[in-house]
Curated annotation (Swiss-Prot):
Family: Belongs to the phosphohexose mutase family.
Gene Ontology cellular component annotations, sorted alphabetically: cytosol
Coiled coil: none
Keyword ATP-binding included in the entry's annotation: no
Protein name per the record: Phosphoglucosamine mutase
Species per Swiss-Prot/TrEMBL record: Thermosynechococcus vestitus (strain NIES-2133 / IAM M-273 / BP-1)
Encoding gene (name): glmM
Active site: 115
Cofactor binding, note field: Binds 1 Mg(2+) ion per subunit.
Cofactor requirement: Mg(2+)
Modifications made to the protein after synthesis: Activated by phosphorylation.
């Protein structure tokens, strides 16, 4: 048999591994065309084994990064080489791909994006046919093929690439149609920070259709500037614009628009914890929140947890990552979950975080309440002072084995003993960046400041050196 020989993806590299949000890294270094092509082929071969209808299409979308065209095309080449029909929808939010895979009988989907990361990074997220991220067992099977460096077999039943940008409008319609007749945002002035990324594709259109007066920032696709000093990780431009425009609220999206943060009319941050609190209150009042339970993460603020418990609610903490939140939601039968960073999951709407849907729901909730977002924020909870610092650790093995660092473990124990139940420490390796994240939360700002600096110095001295 003729074979198409492919360079091993392991040549000169660490083994390829799925992280908390797919495969992510520097485009052209970790994420090469060869890797994307091989990944496409082996994703196809593995997914083929999971269905009795292997001719179902595979859907690919992308954000605005300069490397996204290259990676999307290479991934599509691998999938067509494996015999699949590929529908490339172009620029879209990640939740658009999740929605389309779940509603078009696709065998799977992929989003080319590195979410909130800088423009030079990129990533590939793989979705199963139900719109959820690929399960760990299938990820491991794909990893094994990639890291074996096998040649890609020649097939005679090639697939074809189809450009289907019109499918993005199906997603847009699904978000706006249930509310469009009611026009719930009529008269609402809102600022949208689209981060030069995927949110550009549909977000302003949906807000306009629901009656809002829209002021858009960073509102075209720009691969050089995606997430640069804008979006959900850099709120200053949004805060300033909301105050200057005297807007009721503002929303900032990340590069692939699967998460969102808000600011109120005073420019104060309304993060994922606040959104969960408001949404949880609403579902609780409608008797639609089983066991009054919300799934959050280890990053969620103690102030939120204690305020929710004071309402008679339960809060379960998952590991960081929306797939872990989703798993805990399924385990506990929860309707609502999310992350402080703005990934919000409500099982009324699907299985993944959706920045646009979350923003529309929050804006509608505020309008229906008769109060302003600022008033709702004031009535919610007082967050504990919380500090999050990232320490760059280039050595991957040191990052993954940070728990074996005895000086750091001793310092963590000392900090926790000092704060008792009035604070907490969280140290973890990022699943998306080469950093160790250090978070300290305490009732008093000076205590949080002290232990954060002490722990950052310890990580720097023993892991980053």
């Amino acid at each position: 048999m003729l074979v198409w020989r492919e360079e091993s993806t392991m040549t000169g590299q660490q083994p390829i591994r799925f992280g908390t949000d797919g495969i992510r890294g520097r485009a052209g270094e970790l994420l090469t065309p060869n890797l994307a092509l091989s990944l496409g082929y082996w994703v196809g071969e593995v997914l083929r084994q999971t269905t009795d209808a292997p001719q179902r299409p595979f859907i690919i979308g992308q954000d605005s990064r300069n490397s996204s065209d290259m990676l999307a095309t290479a991934l599509a080449a691998g999938l067509t080489a494996a015999g699949f029909e590929v529908w490339h929808v172009g620029l879209c939010p990640t939740p658009c791909i999740a929605y389309l895979t779940a509603t078009t009988e696709a065998i799977g989907g992929a989003m080319i994006s590195a979410s909130h990361n800088p423009p030079a990074d990129n990533g590939i997220k793989i979705f199963g046919s139900d719109g959820s991220k690929l399960c760990p067992d299938l990820q491991k099977e794909i990893e094994a093929h990639l890291n074996a460096g096998r040649s890609l077999p020649y097939r005679e039943d090639w697939g074809h690439l189809h450009h289907r940008p019109e499918l993005v409008q199906r997603y847009r319609h699904a978000v706006q149609a249930p509310l469009q007749d009611r026009q719930p945002l009529r008269g609402l002035r809102v600022v949208l920070d689209l981060a030069w990324g995927s949110a550009v594709a549909v977000t302003p259109t949906v807000f306009h259709a629901l009656g809002a007066e829209v002021i858009a920032l960073h509102d075209r696709a720009d691969g050089n500037r995606i997430n640069v000093n804008c979006g959900s990780t850099y709120l200053e431009p949004l805060q300033q614009a909301v105050r200057e425009a005297r807007a009721a609220m503002g929303f900032a999206f990340d590069g692939d628009a699967d998460r969102v943060l808000a600011v109120d009319s005073q420019g104060r941050v309304v993060d994922g914890d606040h959104i969960l609190y408001f949404w949880g209150q609403q579902l609780q009042s409608q008797a639609q929140l089983p066991k009054d339970l919300i799934v959050a993460t280890v990053m969620s603020n103690l102030g939120f947890e204690r305020a929710w418990q004071a309402r008679g609610g339960q809060l379960v903490r998952a590991a960081v990552g929306d797939q872990y939140v989703h798993a805990e939601m399924l385990r506990h039968g929860a309707m609502l979950g999310g992350e402080q960073s703005g990934h919000i999951l409500c099982r009324h709407y699907g299985v993944g975080g959706d920045g646009l849907l979350t923003a529309v729901h929050l804006a509608t909730l505020v309008q229906d309440s008769g109060l302003s977002l600022a008033q709702l924020r004031d009535q919610s909870f007082t967050p504990y002072p919380q500090i999050l610092r990232n320490v760059r650790v280039e050595d991957r093995q040191r990052r993954l084995r940070w728990q074996e660092c005895e000086p750091l473990q001793r310092m963590i124990a000392k900090a926790q003993l000092d704060m008792g139940d009035r604070g907490r420490v969280l140290v973890r390796a990022s699943g998306t960046e080469p950093v160790i994240r250090v978070m300290v939360e305490a009732e008093q700002q000076n205590i949080a400041d002290y232990w954060t600096e002490t722990l950052v110095q310890t990580v720097s001295a023993h892991l980053a050196a």
